[in-house]
Amino acid sequence: MRGFAWGWSTDCLGTDISNLDKMADESAAKYENDYAHLDGDGIYFQTFTETDKETIGGKLIADAAVEMVNKAAAKILDKHPDLKIQFGLHATSVHDKLEYIKNVDERVTILWEDCGTFPYTYIPKMQGDFDETLAFTQKIKNLRSGGFGTLFKGMSVLDWGTFKHQPGTYIIGEHSKKKIADKLEEKRKYWKYLQAYWLSNAQYVKKIVEILDSSTLVSALVEDGVFDEKVWFPVAVYSEILWNPNRNIDKIMTEAALIPAAYFA
């Protein structure tokens, strides 16, 4: 699975959506020129939905996004009918415009994020109305016949202040022992903070997962957290919930703590 942006960079509101045909053509061409030859089984993309505004330049984001996505997906799937396409959709800009989103090409799986309070938030505190978040998840789950997925957060994230795109091919995970140890200690402090709230609020992750169908694509962001060195406790808890959410939360937490590789910050 490979990922790239369709029609935007880092500022949705600065995106020009006046020519959706051109945007769709460019997105399809980028796949054809840069990714098709790599023989991946699928692609993940985001477009101009990561904002709390409903419009860009007077155009409704939900309507424009669906039009552009369907055009680009059709062009790609015409040549690559077996390709899996995942659409990373931010609910913040389309929350009240689901009548448009239901028209996304059924061959495209929508991976929803920013759908309310935790587990859709970066910090695993319970801020907001969980019952409303649960109800919205139920609504989008049944919105359309195409693939459905959720993206949970509340774990480590990229430091966007220092982030840079890789300029080319590179070897993953090759650092000195000192570099790894220093990074581990840096991230341990962050994981300790997250871990405290997972201990209190993992039950809400369980409640969301319990209402999802077995066919749901359930994903989570674990970014820049030295995950390749340690399986941090929140990740272990999340994994146990996915494995079988139909258990008492205390049982799930205990099983996660007993995982040999699980690490407490």
Language model region names:
Residues M1-F264:
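Catalytic-core regions of glycoside hydrolase
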